[in-house]
Amino acid sequence: MNISKAEQRVLHVLAKGGYIAFTRDDAGRVTHVQCLTREGLGLADCSLAVFTKLKTKRLILSRQGRPYRVTIDGLKAVRAQLDNR
């Protein structure tokens, strides 16, 4: 599966325990997204376009109105990255 660099960065953060917080408008459409790490720091690469691509590919999922998290398919699709902690 072809995944862009921005999508890889977002999936990597989600795979490590992060989540995507979102806001909806009156019609129920997602209007704003923010990717947060498990420490609570924001990721600048997470845009509405990246969010839509990940959701269309079913790599992220929201259950019962909670923030979006990575799916099993998303974990399989993410490539390993070096963590400079």
Swiss-Prot record:
Alphabetized InterPro entries for the sequence: YjhX_toxin (IPR018654)
Highest taxon of source: Bacteria
Similarity section: Belongs to the UPF0386 family.
NCBIfam families: PRK13687.1
Protein name: UPF0386 protein Spro_1532
